[in-house]
Amino acid sequence: LGPFGPRFTAAKLLAEALPALSNAERRRRSIELLESVGLGEAHLSRKPVTLSGGQRQRVAIARALAAEPEVLVCDEAVSALDVTVQAQVLDLLEHLRVTTGVAMIFISHDIGVVQHIADRVLVMKDGRVVESGDVDAVLGSPTHPYTRALLAAVPTIPGETLASTAPVVSDAGRN
């Protein structure tokens, strides 16, 4: 359940992020936020324990968007989700990036996810950047031994490349 208290509804979680608004404005804005992440008004009354992992992640994204940030930090935002839900959340984040203009810093240990979502990549080892650049350049022709070791550690099916094992983006129904 992460940062969500089990007693709070999605409405309460979103309302906490909108303290300057009246109750009516908070409700209206909460519905807008939920709709922006593929959920709806019916989810306002739901508690985290009744939501799927993907739905909880969408509520968390809606809550973060309530502040209308210029930059959204996504720290392992899809690591606890199954692959199909990962693809849906990644699609959602890409859609939000395009429609709202929010920049994203996406932190992940999953090379396939990084390859799918990122334009640029920083590879860190022991808290220091060891390689950075265009994601295709860094992952396609790594220059640092640590980056090469990370890429070599990615499990693959014989005959498949890293690109072919990245999450599949689909138009499947939202979770």
Protein language model regions, located:
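Conserved ABC ATPase "signature" region
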Residues: 25-42, 151-152
